[in-house]
Amino acid sequence: GDNKLLGSLKEAVQAIGLKDGMTISFHHSFREGDEIIGQVLETIRDLGIKHLRFAPSAVVNIKNSSIVDFVKDGTIDRIEASGIRGSLGDAVLTGLMDEPVILRTHGARPRAIEAGELEIDAAFIGASAADEYGNATGQIGPNACGSLGYSFIDAYCASKVVVVTDNLVEYPCCPASISQQYVDYVVKVDRIGDPEKIGKGAARMTKNPRDLMIAERAADVIAASRMFKENFSFQTGAGAISIACTNYLAERMEKRGVKASFALGGMTA
């Protein structure tokens, strides 16, 4: 394969031919610690590109750069996501957008992309480690964020794919969540995220007594079911109660000597 490393986000945006009205996507695994979305949008704004459809896997309460500002200045005029938190969510509720916002579940979003209902012109995939050929992961590095699963469909289906990392490693990057065959360009920036904030917000560990009570009762229900047996599988999440429930469930698994075949979800946590 070819070396795909470019010198800056500006070079990448120009190389992919991003134009007014196109659709861009991101993943939200860096959660409140994300510093990629702001950098990319600032680059796009500086190049005078406007009226973009902003289609991330979800929007959390991003603190470093307000998405609201990019809507107000016309850089973004449409939003499609799987959920919107924080200042952008508040602004949408109070009439920020002229076009209705489209929200899909985490399962419906990949289906819409695969079916062509949501066509991604450019996917910017943040990675905690990547090599110059485009192999990328979120599992290692100072800003590890877990699986890059939210970006799989973007990598497979987007017209252009740019991997953004602050941790360039020797080829081959391993384990690779995103394979080089799906990547057009790689950009190294100074910083992609704040590791102290990746586990904040919805992905925080909870100490709230009510949350813990709900989590423990949910674990009790699972443990009392006929499905709680050797090689069972379960789906969890990155939410505070889900994390606590998984912890309680682990205690019950150890006590009864039960092992799961696999667990799905909650990768960021």
Segment roles from a protein language model:
Residues 1-269:
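Conserved alpha/beta enzyme-core scaffold
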